[in-house]
Amino acid sequence: MRELRNTKIIAVDHGYGNMKTANTVTPTGIKAYETEPISTGNILEYNGIYYRIGEGHKEFIPDKAMDEEYYLLTLMAIARELNVFSIREADVHLAAGLPLTWIRNQREAFRSYLLQNPEVHYRFNGKEYHLHFAGCSLYPQGYPAIVNHLGNFKGTNLLADIGNGTMNILYINNKKAQESRCWTEKLGVNQCMIAAKNAVLDKFGVKIEESTVEQILRFGTADISAPYLDCISSIARQYVAELFSTLRKYEYNPDLMRLYVVGGGGCLIRNFGTYDKSRVTIIDDICATAKGYESLAYMSLKRRG
């Protein structure tokens, strides 16, 4: 969070797997209850309905403005970021983003969606929040994550933002984003998750917990027997190979350019990929894109005076 003229600039990265702010990460799973849930933890109360947030992930949808739950998740993310600084009431300028190839067509609809209520009262984890929305800045996903690294960029570079639902691809030449050379592929980490769970079911006839698969994808191992680990690792290697195959479809050549990877898919490339580590940079900070949104919005608003 940043502050400018008594307005809190809060960035929210609306992922399919996780909602990220500059300082928080929360899985996107959300479930509604008519009465307050018995157990505590990540409970949003809005318009008389209770929502438990953080168990599981949302499915891919091509237009987030058509899903009311992303508005609720936005309120949750803002509350979590404000809570880091013990703030309960604020004038808020939102900074968010959309996939590279979708932002032109969806920008204004998504902005209206996020700003649908100029003033909002709600409770999160038992604490009252009162927000006044002052505005919203929207940016292409992925690119903001590397803004602070642009000083290291020379010649041709390729950015791959691998999230839970999509992979966004963008060429950056001489530190400038090439808007005519950007693509979005539905090849997010969830595709690997589904394939791994199905492979275990097909081979061993058992269902495996998603959290176990997630641990393997993130860290390369888990406390399970070797045959199961080998099965999931094989699927992960196939998925990473498909990622690189897709990048080559868009003329990726490691001899001629450097590759920068952001998003949750970076850990899969590190754990299961075969690549030249001197030519590929994996940015591990899952909040990097949100931090980039925040920086860009702050600079833009400051220039306006």
Predicted feature residues:
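Nucleotide/phosphate-binding catalytic cleft detector across ATP-hydrolyzing
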Residues: 1-159, 176-191, 203, 211-305
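Conserved blade-register residue in beta-propeller folds
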Residues: 21, 169-171
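Ser/Thr-glycine-rich phosphate-binding loops at phosphate-binding pockets of nucleotides
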Residues: 162-168
